[in-house]
């Protein structure tokens, strides 16, 4: 059901993530499993509640991305969907490069 509300589809993408819960300052390490220009899905056994404001950092071996976001849905003991907001132009380029690479991998069958 969430996918129907997305502006653009998410693609499979694996990377490390660090989330900072804005209100409490609590940090959590997790793994991203899907990515789009507007958000991502984060695998974690302890997802944050819907509506929680976060600051998310996503890391690959070569690049990183960071932006504020909000939890738009959560699946108990599985993970949560994040929507990005106020993404800086430099980081839009990072997202676009990651998405192009992930789409190319998917097309080539890797």
Model-derived features with residue positions:
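Short conserved beta-strand and strand-loop elements enriched in small hydrophobics
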Residues: 15-21, 51-64
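Short, conserved beta-turn/loop elements at beta-strand boundaries and strand-helix junctions
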Residues: 22-24, 37, 74-79
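Conserved hydrophobic positions within beta-strands
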Residues: 32, 69-71
């Amino acid at each position: 059901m969430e996918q129907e509300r997305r502006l653009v589809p998410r693609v499979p993408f694996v990377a490390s993530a660090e989330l900072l819960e804005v209100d409490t300052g609590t940090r959590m390490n997790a793994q991203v499993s899907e990515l789009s220009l507007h958000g991502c899905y984060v695998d974690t056994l302890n997802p944050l509640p819907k509506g929680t404001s976060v600051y998310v950092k996503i890391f690959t071996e070569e690049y990183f991305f960071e932006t504020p976001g909000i939890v738009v849905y959560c699946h108990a003991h599985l993970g949560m969907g994040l929507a990005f907001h106020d993404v800086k132009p430099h980081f839009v380029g990072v997202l676009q490069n990651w998405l192009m690479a992930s789409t190319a991998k998917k097309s080539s069958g890797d």
